[in-house]
Amino acid sequence: RVTARVGLGRGDVLDIERTVKLGGPIHSKGVLILGGFLRGRFARGDPLSLSASLVFEQSYGGIEGDSASLAELLALLSAIAELPLRQDLAVTGSLNQHGTVQPIGGVNEKVEGFFDVCAARGLTGQQGVVIPAANVKHLMLAPRVLDAVRGGHFAVYSVAHADDAVRLFFDREAGEA
């Protein structure tokens, strides 16, 4: 679970994992890229008067990689807009400064892992996983997952841009209040 808090500040995004030496360099780079995205989207004419913090709650081991940077962006946008995120969707994806969602490793394991958790708790037909569009060609999901998707009990969504994920998680277009 990723959480974010925001307030007035100087455009800084504090990576708590890095500060306490639990975040590796690739994860830290991903958080810095989020700052670039936010500045490009919200501070093209004026400074970004924002201070934000990001953390993986109850994580006590090392965090490495950038496959959660889309999730971190969604957590930040939720905190900024004071809008809740859908909790029945998981998300994975790397992000560049322009909002393009980039491929990640282990896509099958990530989809199947969330599916198994949902199946153990009871499929509702609303649950699903959001993955990078560039990873669709890598999908080789287990028959149990394919059957649930075909039956409308679980979904796998692909996104090419952060705005596509905003649509799914907030049920509105990017930029709408």
Where are the model-predicted features located?
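Peripheral, non-AAA+ core regions of ATP-driven protein-machinery
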Residues: 3-22, 26-177
